[in-house]
From Swiss-Prot:
InterPro entries: NusB-like_sf, NusB_fam, NusB_RsmB_TIM44
Function: Involved in transcription antitermination. Required for transcription of ribosomal RNA (rRNA) genes. Binds specifically to the boxA antiterminator sequence of the ribosomal RNA (rrn) operons.
Record carries keyword Endoplasmic reticulum: no
GO cellular component assignments: cytosol
Name of the protein in its database record: Transcription antitermination protein NusB
Keywords: RNA-binding, Transcription, Transcription antitermination, Transcription regulation
Top-level taxon of the source organism: Bacteria
Species of provenance: Rubrobacter xylanophilus (strain DSM 9941 / JCM 11954 / NBRC 16129 / PRD-1)
Keyword Cell membrane: no
Biological processes per GO annotation: DNA-templated transcription termination; transcription antitermination
Membership in a protein family: Belongs to the NusB family.
Length: 139
């Protein structure tokens, strides 16, 4: 399966964890029991997002002008956490790919304004973490 498919799997599990308040581990088990195969990449991302949630939320709060994480829709919040985790912890996913994939998830699963919101927040995070493109200085 593709990374895009794995991201969708991770998104579904992380979303369910967010809206129900359930830990991700039993949800991973339920996914396998009822839906079958879960990509290793999806499992890695789910566990990573759960482990890093507080840090991810702190970064998102710092760049999402006027929209603290708790005010975001659960769908947008989940997409942002997933993409930010990839940007910070998955070396073979360039930040721009994580942003583009998150925008695609937002187009498929969130509201009309979500793709621009998600893209804007993640580009702000990218600038803050990695520095502005072309300035030659790390963030």
């Amino acid at each position: 399966m593709s990374r895009r498919t794995a991201r969708k799997q991770a998104f579904f599990i992380l979303y369910q964890s967010d809206v129900t308040g359930s830990p991700a581990e039993p949800l991973i088990g339920r996914w396998r029991a009822y839906r079958g195969e879960l990509e290793d990449y999806a499992e890695r991302v789910v566990r990573g997002v759960e482990r890093e949630r507080e840090r991810l939320d702190a970064v998102l709060d710092g760049v999402s002008e006027g929209w603290p994480v708790w005010r975001m829709s659960a769908v947008d919040r989940t997409i942002l956490r997933l993409a930010l985790y990839e940007m910070l912890h998955v070396q073979d996913v360039p930040p721009e790919v994580a942003v583009n994939e998150a925008v695609e998830l937002a187009k498929g699963f969130s509201g009309e304004e979500a793709p621009s919101f998600v893209g804007g927040v993640l580009r702000g995070a990218e600038d803050k973490i990695f520095g502005k493109v072309g300035d030659g200085e790390p963030g």
